[in-house]
Regions:
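A recurrent flexible, glycine/aromatic-enriched loop bordering the glycosyltransferase active site
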Residues: 87-106
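Active-site nucleotide-sugar/metal-binding loop of Leloir-type enzymes
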Residues: 12-24
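Short beta-strand-to-loop acidic/aromatic patch adjacent to the donor-nucleotide binding site
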Residues: 22-33
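Acidic donor-binding/catalytic loop of UDP-sugar-dependent glycosyltransferases
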Residues: 32-45
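Short beta-strand-to-loop element that shapes/binds the nucleotide-sugar donor at the catalytic cleft/hinge
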Residues: 59-71
Length: 234
């Protein structure tokens, strides 16, 4: 196995690796730390997962909080009841849920099929768009718990859509950079049929949250940038 580390934005790194003939790309942010056996475990698991699910896949390491290694750095998707405890997750060989671009193994054949990362979406959305594109093209997304990647804890926070009622929550990003998130979500929800069916629910949750928390400036920002993303205005 020949390994190279290439800096710069992920879209530039991946283009360099692809153009130089590499068979495998491992995507990760510069604030993540791979376990010493991460890449080995991902590559060794690839054919096993493909054989089990019967289609091409993108594999991901299990992303642990680097300051509390007993738990994942990120929560799972909305509605998921999957645990965040590492030892429980490691009881499975692989599962259909990932935290992408944190130890993400992509085979060259997948890139040939779905293309490169949309560079304009860098930060809080490029990874989500690429995974949505993969799903749209019939590619499976799986975490391999034997492969571990360490990352700082999620910067967003969960907020109650209606104050004091914790049953319904959304991910709340820091206001200083939230426009990137809104714009990229607009593009993803409006582009892929698998996501479009959930767009009304997502927008309603954002609107209600900002109204009930008196965040009217943030609400205006959400409407502006979500619409820009819907129309691919970058």
């Amino acid at each position: 196995i020949r390994l190279s580390l290439v800096g710069s934005e992920m879209c530039i790194r991946d283009r360099y690796m692809y153009d130089n003939g590499y068979e495998w790309l491992v995507m990760m942010d510069d604030d993540g730390i791979p376990d010493k056996n991460e890449i080995k475990n991902l590559i060794q698991s690839y054919d096993k997962v493909v054989s089990a699910v019967g289609k091409e896949v993108i594999l991901n390491a299990l992303v642990a909080d680097k300051d509390d290694k007993d738990y994942t750095a990120f929560l799972w998707a909305r509605g998921s009841r999957r645990t965040t405890k590492i030892t429980e997750l490691q009881k499975e060989q692989f599962f259909n849920d990932i935290h992408p671009f944190n130890g993400t193994l992509v085979k060259r054949s997948v890139i040939e099929k779905i293309g490169m990362i949309k560079k304009e979406m860098f930060i809080w959305g490029d990874e989500k768009e690429y995974m949505a594109r993969a799903i749209h093209n019939g590619i499976g997304l799986y975490t391999v718990p034997a492969a571990i990647h360490y990352h700082p804890k999620e910067k967003g926070r969960k907020g109650n859509i209606i104050p004091f009622i914790s049953k319904y929550q959304i991910l709340v990003k820091p206001e200083k950079m939230s426009h990137y998130y809104y714009r990229n979500e607009g593009f993803v929800y409006n582009t892929y049929p698998e996501k479009k069916k959930h767009m009304i629910v997502f927008c309603t949750a954002q609107i209600v949250y900002n109204i009930t928390h008196f965040r009217f400036v943030e609400l205006a920002k959400f409407i502006k940038y979500f619409r820009e993303g819907m129309h691919n205005k970058y």
